[in-house]
Amino acid sequence: MAEKPKLHYSNIRGRMESIRWLLAAAGVEFEEKFIKSAEDLDKLRNDGYLMFQQVPMVEIDGMKLVQTRAILNYIASKYNLYGKDIKEKALIDMYIEGIADLGEMILLLPFSQPEEQDAKLALIQEKTKNRYFPAFEKVLKSHGQDYLVGNKLSRADIHLVELLYYVEELDSSLISSFPLLKALKTRISNLPTVKKFLQPGSPRKPPMDEKSLEESRKIFRF
């Protein structure tokens, strides 16, 4: 029996959460080795496990993979969540780059200066409502299918629904004008593997709070 993937990161969402989501949606059980101190991170670096001296790092299939996109690409390919041909893969890549653009803004929001947060939140709300959500609503409307690409579950659906949850935490009203996105969120959330991941006690991480922010500052020395 193959070993479970082992995820090396701190006990926060950060850049590992999309990896947790994708593995969970694929029905893959995984272990987490939490980095709890700067010394834990130094040990991984000194042992030569981090090619570019940074996490996330995932041990899978005899490899120690770093760089979030590389890890996600491997998982999506391995578990048939990356389209059936190069055209579908290109569409998936295009969609997830857009998802990542908005996701990055949300990811970095808690780390910004307090006096900047209101303006940055307003920018996220504006771009969500006027740029990103309309684009994905249009895709779903254009083909009338249940999923973004090829009428089959792909990583694009999973990453988008993860993003929808994050946006909902910031402003639950933003999705109200996008019925097809709401339907996609419900559809993906009801998949057995995703439903399990959304339950309390799963490896899914909560939003960043002051305590986890301070712990992150100590671990990553910023």
UniProtKB/Swiss-Prot annotation:
Bias (Basic and acidic residues): 206-222
Residues annotated as domain GST C-terminal: 85-207
Domain GST N-terminal: 3-83
UniProt-annotated binding residues for glutathione: Y9, R45, Q54, V55, Q67, T68
GO BP term, pick one: epithelial cell differentiation
Start and end residues of each stretch annotated as Disordered: 199-222
Keywords, alphabetical: Acetylation, Cytoplasm, Transferase
GO molecular function: glutathione transferase activity
A Gene Ontology term for the protein's cellular component: extracellular exosome
Classification via PANTHER family: GLUTATHIONE S-TRANSFERASE, GLUTATHIONE S-TRANSFERASE A2
The name this protein goes by in its record: Glutathione S-transferase A2
Species name: Homo sapiens
